[in-house]
């Protein structure tokens, strides 16, 4: 009888430990899923993204924009391929116009690029990159690096590679 009690106690302890482990790992997985989900239309916070310590690509567009729709599968692929190495976000400005208020967006789609330290990405060869550099009106410091229009996968990969992502 004592042996049966010992076995029951050990089984109970084991089940509790396994349950705690599953609970903790599930919440970590949910945090990572939220952090790396592509659509940031309603929860876009660039400062929070910058604090993650990963390079960032933000694409401002709209579900009703044809070039944006054409880029959607590419952004999904990039988001999946670079998960944990870079953050790729899409913000639908027709659903959340406030998300774009601090960015110089003139047309959609427009992409913005940030280094892992949160600073605007600066390509080695600005003239050949087809990227636009924006400076702050207050102090003339480099504030944004952007691209207007569509980019293809090789363009994104080249930029990410130059940002130090393999």
What are these regions (language model features)?
Residues 68-82:
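Typically the conserved alpha-helix immediately C-terminal to a functionally engaged Cys/Sec
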Residues 113-166:
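Non-catalytic, surface beta->alpha helical segment in thiol-disulfide oxidoreductase systems
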């Amino acid at each position: 009888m004592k042996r049966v009690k010992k076995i029951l106690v050990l089984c109970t302890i084991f089940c509790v430990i396994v349950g705690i482990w599953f609970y903790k790992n599930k919440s970590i997985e949910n945090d990572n899923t939220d952090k790396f989900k592509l659509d940031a239309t309603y929860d876009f916070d660039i400062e929070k993204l910058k604090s993650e310590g990963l390079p960032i690509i933000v694409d401002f567009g709209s579900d009703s924009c044809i070039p944006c729709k054409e880029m959607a599968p590419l952004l999904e692929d990039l988001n999946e391929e670079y998960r944990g190495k870079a953050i790729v976000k899409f913000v639908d400005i027709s659903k959340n116009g406030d998300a774009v208020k601090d960015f110089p967006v003139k047309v959609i789609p427009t992409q913005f690029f940030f280094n892992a330290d949160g600073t605007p990405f600066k390509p080695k060869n600005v003239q050949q990159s087809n990227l636009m550099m924006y400076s702050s009106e207050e102090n003339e410091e480099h504030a944004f690096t952007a691209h207007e229009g569509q980019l293809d996968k090789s363009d994104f990969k080249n930029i990410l590679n130059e940002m130090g992502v393999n």
